[in-house]
């Protein structure tokens, strides 16, 4: 594709995204599907360029002055050296790292100035491309041997099931994916899922399951015994979860709709409950740079309250002596350690071990938090 047509599609993507409400990754995917003449090399160029523009949009707009047309933004972007631009002492701190001031100040209130700058800068880089192998169907070394010479891969250092690709590929088109040998999942997300240390024969409830990513990660621990329930308020997510469970060969799991009458019979019966709570998603901004421009920091109190309500509701399903895992993909103490303290003060539970805190600045993974609690044996 010529430079003219690449720039043509780039402008169509940027302008089109600005007028709709889809997440950036889904919008790009839909556009590519509708424009099949765009080759793989140009698809990669368009995606990487758009993601980089959105990562640095705050600084780009600052340098643009009053005009903010996409054409002008793109011209500024092409002259921007992102490795040095943030070092300009004349720039306001939030502009230098290309974050909205409200979100920057919110992060700073929890992490302090130095850690906030470090976090914001790494959030403006590309996240690693990580997958998790399905041990019900294969093992990590077998897949790495299979891909040797075709792709550049390496094993994750902390997740025994993780593999990191040097470059993004058409993973969903691979036979290995269609056969259920792997799923895309950040290494940090895998580690959070492994906090659910379920044993064969136990009962597990994934209370905010979404499309089932974390269930797919811990399901193998039950050795195809016991029962896993996937619950979510979003029916379309559960439809996708059902497809993924089938592809992975997981047969001891069932979908639990939000209004399912069976829910009442499950209270006080679960050995494990996972609460992957709705959150700001601040730990995943490398993958979702558009989110930071949509986030209203004034909503943090509402988010905290929602997390507390969900945790209290989920706790009702844990049997006395059972365990509940609270997890977020956030790096904000407001959603993590502050909530952990609130739960301990307001429920008959105790903390099991130390919480898991993952930051892109330390571990290179996405930012996650996870804490395991045990329900009082006298509660019912």
What does each of the following model-derived ranges do?
Residues 1-380:
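S-adenosylmethionine
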């Amino acid at each position: 594709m010529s430079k003219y047509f690449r720039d043509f599609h780039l402008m169509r993507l940027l302008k089109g995204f600005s007028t709709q409400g889809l997440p950036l990754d889904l919008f790009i995917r839909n556009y590519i599907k509708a424009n099949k003449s765009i080759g793989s090399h140009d698809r990669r160029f368009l995606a990487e360029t758009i993601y980089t523009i959105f990562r640095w949009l705050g600084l780009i707009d600052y340098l643009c002055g009053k005009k903010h047309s996409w054409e002008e933004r793109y011209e500024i972007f092409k002259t921007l050296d992102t490795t040095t631009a943030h070092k300009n002492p004349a720039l306001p701190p939030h502009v230098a790292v290309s974050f909205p001031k409200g979100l920057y100040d919110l992060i700073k209130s929890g992490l302090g100035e130095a850690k906030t700058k470090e976090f914001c800068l790494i959030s403006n880089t590309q996240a690693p491309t990580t997958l998790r192998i399905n041990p019900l169907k294969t093992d990590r070394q077998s897949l790495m041997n299979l891909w040797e010479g075709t792709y550049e891969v390496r094993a994750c250092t902390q997740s025994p099931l993780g593999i990191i690709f040097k470059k993004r590929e058409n993973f969903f088109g691979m036979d290995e994916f269609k056969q259920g040998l792997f799923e895309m999942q950040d290494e940090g997300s895998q580690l959070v899922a492994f906090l659910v240390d379920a044993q064969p024969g136990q009962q597990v409830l994934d209370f905010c399951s979404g499309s089932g990513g974390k269930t797919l990660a811990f399901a193998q621990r039950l050795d195809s015994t016991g029962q896993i329930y996937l619950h979510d308020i979003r029916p379309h997510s559960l439809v996708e979860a059902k497809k993924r469970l089938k592809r992975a060969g997981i047969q001891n799991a069932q979908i639990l709709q939000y209004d399912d009458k069976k829910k009442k019979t499950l209270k006080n019966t679960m050995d494990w409950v996972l609460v992957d709570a709705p959150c700001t998603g601040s730990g995943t901004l490398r993958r979702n740079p558009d989110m930071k421009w949509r986030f209203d920091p004034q909503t943090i109190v509402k988010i905290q309250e929602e997390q507390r309500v969900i945790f209290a509701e989920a706790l009702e399903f844990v049997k006395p002596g059972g365990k509940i895992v609270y997890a977020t993909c956030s790096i904000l103490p407001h959603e993590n350690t502050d909530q952990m303290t609130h739960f301990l003060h307001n429920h008959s539970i105790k903390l099991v071990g130390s919480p898991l805190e993952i930051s892109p600045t330390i571990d290179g993974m996405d930012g996650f938090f996870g804490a395991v609690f045990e329900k009082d044996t006298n509660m019912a």
